[in-house]
Amino acid sequence: MIQAKLIAPSLQRRIHSLDSSVGRSAVPANDKRRHRKGEQQTVIAVILAGGKGTRISEESYLRPKPMIELGGKPILWHIMKIYSAAGVYDFVICCGYRGYVIKSYFANYFMHVCDVTFDIARNQMQVHQSAAEPWKVTLVDTGEETMTGGRKKRVAKYLGTEDFFLTYGDGLADIDLKALLEFHRAQNVLATVTSVRPPGRFGALVTDGGRVINIREKPQGTSWINGGFFVLSPKVINYIQGDHTVWEVDPLESLAREGKLAAYEHEGFWHPMDTLRDKNQLEGLWGSGKAPWKVWT
């Protein structure tokens, strides 16, 4: 996760109740993706899922980082459930490194979440206890070496003309996405980033006379950093030159200089999965039954 130097000046956090405009579809009229009859239309969520995960290579050698599992489900699934809990069901996934693993997962989704019976003689398959999510997922090959900005530019044709969500495929939070969207719309900006305080990564030694008398977990950081969970206008694509553009550098810095970038301060839980230690910590939280990011029922 790259820290961005970006907080827009003198922006006050204002949270209001969500109005009916949140339900407007971000899908253009000529887009082939259609919402099923009776299905709630939602803002699109774009998830960056093309990275190699070099700092957690033990887990990402054969699969992309967003497919590393927590509790038997890819972290990508957990992120999508966070959005789904807020009524967001339309996803665009930016694939890259071993993107076919992500495509295969969704192509065989029922095989992962349901019991099935195969009648070999009749060449039939029966799915039991269907656990289908109300999701519409567009998987886009954005290149193995494409930078974060370039990946967004490559999926621009799927974004329509409305504001959309964007986040990284390796970070979890208990963020109120409806409040985030309302905050963004109240600021009259092109982009809003969720700012978070980084979790402590190293234990602090308490010593007395050269002897360790206690070990305390390092407290949460005090500086605000880029935590992902953006809300963006499609106009931000104009700030991206091409595949080589790093979203967290030139585009965000330009938006900040122009006063078009807001920061939504999230004081709650946020944790990236950058290392094997992070993965084990998140796995422990999930196994305890008290995972803070589990905002769905």
Regions found by a protein language model. Give the residues of each.
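A cross-taxon signal for low-complexity, glycine/charged-rich
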Residues: 1, 7, 12-14, 29, ...
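N-terminal glycine-rich phosphate-binding loop and ensuing alpha1 helix
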Residues: 39-108, 139
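Structural beta-sheet core signal
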Residues: 45-47, 93, 166, 191-194, ...
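Well-ordered alpha-helical segments embedded in enzymatic catalytic cores
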Residues: 78, 150-154, 251
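Conserved beta-loop-beta/alpha segment of the NTase-like Rossmann-fold superfamily
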Residues: 102-208
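Catalytic-core segments of class I nucleotidyltransferases/pyrophosphorylases
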Residues: 163-165, 172, 176-185, 197-202, ...
